[in-house]
Amino acid sequence: MSAAEKILELPGLRVTVDRVVYQPDAQTPPDRPHCFVYYITIHNDSEATVTIKGRKWVVTNEGGDVTVVEGEGVVGKLPRIDPGEKFSYNSFHLLDTRCAVAEGSYLGVDPNGRKVLTRIPRFEMVVPGGN
């Protein structure tokens, strides 16, 4: 990455993980039977409008196996978040183990074309009541 492509953490752009819910009745593939729905809000308390262009998730299961998921946008959208506004959504992770942690980042761009990043706080996904 060249210096011109430097990605900045924009003060005031932050993410909250509002809720994580285990969905025991979700239809899942046999190799990933545990579904966790997460609810996230991206808050723009900065002075610049930000358009979220992509995301990166790093999910580590209880055995130490790491899965990296990268993609364009957020739930099929490229949300434009004006100063003082927020964008909330929910999605899910499918796990092959009973416990994992997830964290990551969103990549965006400001009106001047500068690339910005905000981190997704680490959160746990644990199947309730199991050994």
Residue ranges and their predicted role:
Residues 2-33:
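Low-complexity, acidic Ser/Thr/Pro/Gly-rich terminal tails and inter-domain linkers that flank the onset
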Residues 5, 94-131:
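Terminal connector regions
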Residues 5-7, 41, 56-58, 105-107:
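Residue-level detector of beta-strand face positions
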Residues 32-39, 101-103:
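Short, solvent-exposed loop/turn segments enriched in Ser/Thr/Gly
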Residues 42-46:
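Asparagine-centered strand-capping/turn motif at beta-strand->loop junctions
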Residues 48-67, 108:
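Short acidic, flexible loop segments centered on an aromatic residue
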Residues 67-99:
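Intrinsically disordered, low-complexity Pro/Gly/Ser/Thr-rich segments with frequent PxxP/GP/PP motifs
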